[in-house]
UniProtKB/Swiss-Prot annotation:
Belongs to the universal ribosomal protein uL5 family. Transmembrane segments: none annotated. InterPro entries: Ribosomal_uL5, Ribosomal_uL5_bac-type, Ribosomal_uL5_C, Ribosomal_uL5_CS, Ribosomal_uL5_dom_sf, Ribosomal_uL5_N. The keyword tRNA-binding applies. Gene3D superfamilies: 3.30.1440.10. It comes from Azoarcus sp. (strain BH72). This is Large ribosomal subunit protein uL5. Pfam families: Ribosomal_L5, Ribosomal_L5_C. The keyword rRNA-binding applies. This is one of the proteins that bind and probably mediate the attachment of the 5S RNA into the large ribosomal subunit, where it forms part of the central protuberance. In the 70S ribosome it contacts protein S13 of the 30S subunit (bridge B1b), connecting the 2 subunits; this bridge is implicated in subunit movement. Contacts the P site tRNA; the 5S rRNA and some of its associated proteins might help stabilize positioning of ribosome-bound tRNAs. The lineage of its organism: Bacteria, Pseudomonadati, Pseudomonadota, Betaproteobacteria, Rhodocyclales. One of its GO terms (cellular component) is ribonucleoprotein complex.
Amino acid sequence: MARLQQFYKDEVVPQLLKQFGYKSVMEVPRITKITLNMGVGEAVGDKKVLENAIGDMTKIAGQKPVATKARKSIAGFKIREGYPIGCMVTLRGPRMFEFFDRLVTVALPRVRDFRGIAAKGFDGRGNYNLGVKEQIIFPEIEYDKIDALRGMNISITTTAKSDDEARALLAAFKFPFKN
């Protein structure tokens, strides 16, 4: 069992039960999945760029991502429907908790001029989105072996009904919000 998974059962659940006055343990919000998405627009001209992005994301997530394809053709961007233009991976279960642990304890503190994560990334339904500008904040990526700095979107999906519940859940996991 992942360290944060045990922490959730032992520390977070009792804290949120008390804070929100839930009647059942099953009402307590939990993280259901974490989705990593990387758009690689340069992949239109060079297929090697997408392969490198998939390699980076495989190292970060510990799971092979799927290539995302363009839904429709856009002449201005020189893309056709069906062209691979990015990659994404969905993490659940122990892998999700391991990634979240690395994100909170190792990766986010390595961001340059890091002062905390803005609380405006909630979507109104208890899910949180954040963007990372460069993949080198993760210790699995070696700075010398990357071809380009690429950002990614990290989407944390929870069972929380409101943003307040989701914020309390992530704060209980020591997520570094700005005050």
